[in-house]
Amino acid sequence: MKIEARAPTRIDLAGGTLDIWPLYLFHEGAQTVNCAITRYASCRIETHRGPGITLVSRDTRRSETFASLTALARARRYRLPLLAHLVRYFQPRSGFTLTTNSEAPAGAGIGGSSAMAVAICAAL
């Protein structure tokens, strides 16, 4: 089975990071204004027989493979921590390859990691 999902990144128009802890503790009632842009984070899951899990990030050119979900959960460090932690949370029942790609440059401040998390959650 193949599942694909994507989510747009965003830009801040006003309010910047006032919605992030601990800043919102000091600015009661603070609001932010954002809008989605056409730079997407996307993921594809391809299931296969067997328990193996492979995580691939095309834009960062990183990957890692685990013999099973148990092996992933027992790992102390990850090359792709966002992907690994989301897989641990959802605990899929079969083996698969999860491939991601982001059109947003790393560190650009346009919500690339959040958009990636949304896309992965939708696919899982």
What residues fall within each predicted segment?
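ATP-binding N-lobe of GHMP and related small-molecule kinases
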Residues: 1-110, 122-123
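Stable alpha-helical structural segments in soluble proteins, enriched in small hydrophobic residues
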Residues: 115-124
